[in-house]
Amino acid sequence: MARLLTTCCLLALLLAACTDVALSKKGKGKPSGGGWGAGSHRQPSYPRQPGYPHNPGYPHNPGYPHNPGYPHNPGYPHNPGYPQNPGYPHNPGYPGWGQGYNPSSGGSYHNQKPWKPPKTNFKHVAGAAAAGAVVGGLGGYAMGRVMSGMNYHFDSPDEYRWWSENSARYPNRVYYRDYSSPVPQDVFVADCFNITVTEYSIGPAAKKNTSEAVAAANQTEVEMENKVVTKVIREMCVQQYREYRLASGIQLHPADTWLAVLLLLLTTLFAMH
């Protein structure tokens, strides 16, 4: 009997110990109503704080949403000086605005045409040629060096006088063909003369371009000009050939040398008479 009672007491103590351990673990995992979460909800100084949710100075601040100077400011969106400013997109002071780029006239690079040298008159190019302008390489042609101080041979004193009075109006260089191989003098001079009178628009072809009234009024002057200038061009072409011959290393044959001397003597005799 005593042994049974002792066994029951031990079982009761063991059951009580297990229950106490289980309750302690349950209390640690899930806090009861006395934890920090429940206590925080019952804190009287936080949810009913009068200075935060019912602050009359923030949501009902009349100075911010109803500020008449910001959303309805007439000076910003309707500023006449920016979007409708006539001086910006159509600014006439900037070269080539709205036209693109053109190296010769500032025009558009759209539909740009290749540059072509203008047709010049013998008189009009006098200043540029005398100043040493480079006009070489036009269609296989080249322009010779400046020939100043040459003594030209004319047929009459009137021609000498006319050239002395008007020589400053004309260039002192000629065009010649850019040959790939040496050529004789007659070929060089003929090509040089034809190219030069064509480029300078003188001679019979120039007479056709003038009106009949102007041609009749200046007939004497035009005839004198054509006569004198064509002689000057031919002599400049001869001089240009001499320089071309020296640069190319061309040697004259004896017959050509005697012919050149004879022509020079004849020209001198005609000039003396």
UniProtKB/Swiss-Prot annotation:
Keywords attached to this entry: Amyloid, Cell membrane, Copper, Disulfide bond, Glycoprotein, GPI-anchor, Lipoprotein, Membrane, Metal-binding, Prion, Repeat, Signal
Distribution of this protein across tissues and organs: Spinal cord and brain.
UniProt binding sites for Cu(2+) 4: 90, 93
Residue ranges crossing the lipid bilayer per the database entry: none
Comp. bias (Polar residues): 101-111
Binding residue positions for Cu(2+) 1: 66
GO terms for biological process, alphabetical: protein homooligomerization
Biased composition (Low complexity): 51-94
Residues engaged in binding Cu(2+) 3: 78
SS bond list: 192-237
GO molecular function: copper ion binding
Protein name: Major prion protein homolog
UniProt source species: Gallus gallus
Gene transcribed to yield this protein: PRNP
